[in-house]
Design a protein with these regions (language model features):
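Conserved glycine-rich cofactor-binding loop
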Residues: 10-11
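Substrate-binding pocket helix/loop in short-chain dehydrogenase/reductase
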Residues: 83-84, 91-93
Length: 227
């Protein structure tokens, strides 16, 4: 049975990805220890994989016990809403530390295991990694950088499959925070309507589709938006 490590597994999209891959893969549920991660592990019968993408030692410890890894899903991410003039350098550093540098560091640490399995690396990017919208300055910049890293990895590691997925707005806690920010700056009512957004399960299904594509196919990118 192939193996899959999912970062940010306790989140809305992460837990949906875990559920989507559970029937076909041995899972490692990556993330900081939390009751939510423990509950997901119990529900799926999969081990938690303690991981802090801002801590180099945590990344090395998580990677060193895996000799082979078939699938790595980079799902962890942070968002600090704000226009350029509102932002502060610390938010930019924090955005890049998790969204880019953490993903790069974990990929490098797991590269021997991925090469050994001729594995697949999936990056959960964002529509913000293709087009910049007001109030998404540091997040968009980090997602554009993540897209470039995925493209570089694909070019430099021909034995691996590398897929970037660019979901539009998805019903998650991060989305609720973004809507609250947008409502505050526009004096809106702040009403959150999940029906306007993609379901996490929809994004997870696309991950499963990419991962389960036969060996003769290599899915480079998937773009999906709310219908």
């Amino acid at each position: 049975v192939p193996s899959a490590l999912i970062t940010g597994a306790a989140g809305g999209i992460g837990s949906a990805i875990a559920a989507a891959l559970a029937p076909t893969h041995t899972l490692f549920l990556g993330g900081r220890q939390s009751a939510r991660l423990d509950a997901l592990a119990e529900r799926l019968g999969a081990p938690t994989w303690p991981l802090d993408l801002t801590d180099a030692d945590s990344i090395e410890s998580a990677a060193e016990v895996l000799s082979e890894l078939d699938v790595l899903v980079h799902n962890a991410g942070v968002l600090y809403p704000g226009r350029v003039a509102e932002s502060i350098p610390e938010q930019w550093r924090a955005s890049f530390e998790v969204n880019v540098t953490g993903a790069v560091a974990l990929t490098l640490a797991l590269l021997p295991a991925l090469r050994a399995a001729r594995g697949h690396v999936v990056f959960i990017n964002s529509g913000a990694g293709q087009k910049v919208s007001p109030g998404m300055a540091s997040y968009s910049a980090s997602k554009f950088a993540l897209r470039a890293f995925a493209d570089a990895l694909r070019a430099d590691e021909p034995s691996l499959r590398v897929t970037s997925i660019f979901p539009g707005r998805t019903d998650t806690e991060m989305q609720r925070d973004l809507v609250a920010y947008e409502s505050a700056v526009t004096d809106g009512a702040g009403e959150y309507d999940p029906a306007k957004f993609l379901k996490p399960e929809t994004v997870a299904g696309l991950v499963a589709t990419a991962v389960n594509t036969p060996p003769d196919g290599h899915v480079h990118e998937i773009v999906v938006r709310p219908g």
